[in-house]
Curated annotation (Swiss-Prot):
The gene is rlmN. Gene3D superfamilies: 1.10.150.530, Aldolase class I. The lineage of its organism: Bacteria, Bacillati, Actinomycetota, Actinomycetes, Mycobacteriales. Binds 1 [4Fe-4S] cluster. The cluster is coordinated with 3 cysteines and an exchangeable S-adenosyl-L-methionine. GO terms for biological process: rRNA base methylation; tRNA methylation. Specifically methylates position 2 of adenine 2503 in 23S rRNA and position 2 of adenine 37 in tRNAs. Residues 114-351 form the Radical SAM core domain. Its EC number is 2.1.1.192. S-adenosyl-L-methionine binds at G183, E184, S217, S240, L241, H242, N319. It comes from Rhodococcus jostii (strain RHA1). This is Probable dual-specificity RNA methyltransferase RlmN. Belongs to the radical SAM superfamily. RlmN family. Disulfide bonds join C121-C362. GO terms for molecular function: 4 iron, 4 sulfur cluster binding; metal ion binding; rRNA (adenine(2503)-C2-)-methyltransferase activity; rRNA binding; tRNA (adenine(37)-C2)-methyltransferase activity; tRNA binding. The keyword Signal does not apply.
Length: 369
C-alpha cells in the first residue's frame, strides 16, 4: 500500500552544482569569458562547441588555445553528470541512463528510438514532491531541483550518443524531448524554462530543436501553466489529469487539493489559446480505479467543453511499480474507454508503452543504483 506523503513545492536547500556554460544566456556567457581574461568572440566559440558540436570537454576543443583549455574547463565546463549505468530493452530501442550528479544525487533519462524519430525523456528534479501514489518517483520524495545545465546536459549527451552511433540502430538524430522523467517541471519553473530556451534556440545559443518537438508535462500547477503560456513558447503542454472528477483526483494527484480539475482545465485552455497548440491530457488507466465507463464519458464532456478541438487524450496503461496494489486495466476495458472518449468528440489514443522491463516506463523512474 502506498504511504500518503506530503506535497512538497519547494525543493530542499541543497547546494546546486557549479556554474556551467549551459546555465548562461548569451550576455552572461560573454561576461563570463571576459572575467577569464579572454576575448569576447570566445563566448560564441565555446557555445558552438557545446551546442552545435555537442562537445563538453575543452581539451577536445581544437579551436581553443591549449594554454587556456584547463582554465575554461574549470570555470565553464565542470562535469555535471556522470553515467553510472545504461540499461536497454525493446530490442535495444529503449535505453535508460542512470546519472550521478556532482553531489552524488541520482537521476535518470530515457532514450527511445522509433522508425521515424528518437525521443528523449528527461528529468527536471531529482525525485518529485507531488506524492502521486501510483508513481515510483512521487513515492520516493523530492531530493532537489536540477540546474538548467543539468537538464540541458541530458539532452546534449543523448544527441551526441545518437550522432556517434553509440545506441542501437546506428547513427541518428535526436528529434523530440519530453519533460516526463523525474520531477514536476513547473515546480522548478525558472530553470526548466531556461532549459527549454537552450534546447530550442539555434546555435550558438542552443541545441536547435524545434519548440514544437518539446513537451513539458505537469500534474496541474494552474498558476504556473498560465505563466508558461505568457512565455510565448510553442512547446506542447501535457497535463497529467488521470481522472475527471475532483473526489478521486484529490487522492490520485494530491495537488488537486490545491487546484481543482476545473482550475487546471481553465489554465490549460489559456495555454492552448495563447500558444495555438493542442494540449495533451495524460491518463494512466488503473484497473477498477479510474477506468469506469462513466469516467470516460465525463472526461470527454469536460475536455470538449474546456478545450474544444485543442486537446488530445493519451491513455497510458498503468506501469507496475514496487509495492503498488494497482495494475493496468484489461484491454477490453481500455478499448471501451477510448471508444467513449471518442464518442464525445475528443481525440484519444493509447500510448505505446516502452521500457517496462527496465523500470524506464512512465511512473517507474526511481533512480535506484
Amino acid at each position: 500500500m502506498a504511504v500518503s506523503l506530503p506535497l512538497v513545492f519547494t525543493a530542499p536547500r541543497r547546494g546546486m552544482p557549479p556554474k556551467h556554460l549551459a546555465d548562461l544566456d548569451s550576455a552572461e556567457r560573454r561576461e563570463a569569458v571576459k572575467e577569464l581574461g579572454l576575448p569576447g568572440f570566445r563566448a560564441d566559440q565555446l557555445a558552438r562547441q557545446y551546442y552545435a558540436r555537442l562537445e563538453a570537454d575543452p581539451e577536445k576543443m581544437t579551436d581553443l588555445p591549449a594554454a587556456v583549455r584547463e582554465q575554461v574547463g574549470a570555470a565553464l565546463f565542470p562535469t555535471l553528470l556522470t553515467p553510472v549505468k545504461h540499461l536497454a530493452c525493446d530490442g535495444g530501442d529503449t535505453r535508460k541512463t542512470l546519472w550521478k550528479a556532482n553531489d552524488g544525487t541520482l537521476l535518470e533519462s530515457v532514450l527511445m528510438r522509433y522508425p521515424d524519430r528518437a525521443t528523449l525523456c528527461i528529468s527536471s528534479q531529482a525525485g518529485c514532491g507531488m506524492a502521486c501514489p501510483f508513481c515510483a518517483t512521487g513515492q520516493g520524495g523530492l531530493q532537489r531541483n536540477l540546474s538548467t545545465a543539468e537538464i540541458v546536459d541530458q539532452v546534449r549527451a543523448a544527441a551526441a550518443a545518437l550522432r556517434d552511433g553509440d545506441v542501437h540502430g546506428g547513427p541518428g538524430r535526436l528529434s523530440n524531448v519530453v519533460f516526463m522523467g523525474m520531477g514536476e517541471p513547473l515546480a522548478n519553473y525558472k530553470r526548466v524554462v531556461a532549459a527549454v530556451r537552450r534546447i530550442t534556440s539555434p546555435a550558438p545559443d542552443g541545441l536547435g530543436l524545434s519548440q514544437r518537438s518539446v513537451t513539458v508535462s505537469t500534474v496541474g500547477l494552474a498558476p504556473a501553466i498560465r505563466k508558461l503560456a505568457d512565455e510565448d513558447l510553442s512547446v506542447t503542454l501535457a497535463v497529467s489529469l488521470h481522472t475527471p472528477d475532483d473526489e478521486l483526483r484529490d487522492t490520485l494527484v494530491p495537488v488537486n487539493n490545491r487546484w481543482s480539475v476545473a482550475e487546471v482545465l481553465d489554465a490549460a485552455r489559456y495555454y492552448a489559446d495563447k500558444s495555438g497548440r493542442r494540449v495533451s491530457i495524460e491518463y494512466a488507466l488503473i484497473r477498477d480505479v479510474n477506468d469506469q465507463p462513466w469516467r470516460a464519458d465525463l472526461l470527454g464532456k469536460k475536455l470538449r467543453k474546456a478545450l474544444g478541438p485543442l486537446v488530445h487524450v493519451n491513455l497510458i496503461p498503468l506501469n507496475p511499480t514496487p509495492g503498488s496494489e494497482w495494475d493496468a486495466s484489461p484491454k477490453p476495458v481500455e478499448k471501451e474507454f477510448v471508444r467513449r472518449v471518442l464518442a464525445q468528440g475528443v481525440s484519444c489514443t493509447v500510448r505505446d508503452t516502452r521500457g517496462q522491463e527496465i523500470a524506464a516506463a512512465c511512473g517507474q523512474l526511481a533512480a535506484e543504483n
